[in-house]
């Protein structure tokens, strides 16, 4: 995307910023080349790219948000809620490429920013993936923190202990790929890949600019993550 000056970006997170972000990204997506499998073959790697003409779906109503929160047993923090009320999700699905069992690149598709009404299976998989990723490192990479208590000798008991720890921690709400919004405390956006967890956005505005817009802007102050229950010990 085109480099933009800091003063062109609305300074506060709010509806004007989100409207600006929507217009800016849709303009860029209207001009980008349609991705092809050949693009990924030249790179020698899999991944996902935005399709030409990608657009935001538009926001959810209060009633729709209430139904979603009940269905998924979540509570969106204020900034995430406003994002869902103004922009919500992207369409069409992203063009993706991945390797098959014969190590050949094959075309696929995946959600961009999750649509909380249409992407239920993907969202539930993203929730489950948090625990599954941690358990992979528990079983294969010697992950077990002293603060978790004694390491059970039984695999089912280890799974139950990790699941209980995650259940007692602030929820991680899927927003895009393996990026998650912290549901309680500072509105951080975390990149979560197994137990490799980093801060990808110091707040939602910072995250959206980082993810979507090639721009120079003043980043918010670094957030002290050490006090975040459970996740703080894992954030690198």
Regions found by a protein language model. Give the residues of each.
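A surface-exposed partner-binding patch
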Residues: 2-167, 173, 177
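Low-complexity, glycine/alanine/valine/leucine- and proline-rich hydrophobic stretches
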Residues: 183-215
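Low-complexity, Gly/Ser/Thr/Pro-rich intrinsically disordered linker/tail segments
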Residues: 220-236
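Short, well-ordered loop/turn elements at secondary-structure boundaries
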Residues: 167-171, 176, 184-186, 193-194
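Short alpha-helical interface patches
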Residues: 62-70, 204-215, 236
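Structured loops at beta-to-helix junctions and adjacent beta-edge loops in soluble globular domains
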Residues: 87, 176-178, 193-195, 202, ...
């Amino acid at each position: 995307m085109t480099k933009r000056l800091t003063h062109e970006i609305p300074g506060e997170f709010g509806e004007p910023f989100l409207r600006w972000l929507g217009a800016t990204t849709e303009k860029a997506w209207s001009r980008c080349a349609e991705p092809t499998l050949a693009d990924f073959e030249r790179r020698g790697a899999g991944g996902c790219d935005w399709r030409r003409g990608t657009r935001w779906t538009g926001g959810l109503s209060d009633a729709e948000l209430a139904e979603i929160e009940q269905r998924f047993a979540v509570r969106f923090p204020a900034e995430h809620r406003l994002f869902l009320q103004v922009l919500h999700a992207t369409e069409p699905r992203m063009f993706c490429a991945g390797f098959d069992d014969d190590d050949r690149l094959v075309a696929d598709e995946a959600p961009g920013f999750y649509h909380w009404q249409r992407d239920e299976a993907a969202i539930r998989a993203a929730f489950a993936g948090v625990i599954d990723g941690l358990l992979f490192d528990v079983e294969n990479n010697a992950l077990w923190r002293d603060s978790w208590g004694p390491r059970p000798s039984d695999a089912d008991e280890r799974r139950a202990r990790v699941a209980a720890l995650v259940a007692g921690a602030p929820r991680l709400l899927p927003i895009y790929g393996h990026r998650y919004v912290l549901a309680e405390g500072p509105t951080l956006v975390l990149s979560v890949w197994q137990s490799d967890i980093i801060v990808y956005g110091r707040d939602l505005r910072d995250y959206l600019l980082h993810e979507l817009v090639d721009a120079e802007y003043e980043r918010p102050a670094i957030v002290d993550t050490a006090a975040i229950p459970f996740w703080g010990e894992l954030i690198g």
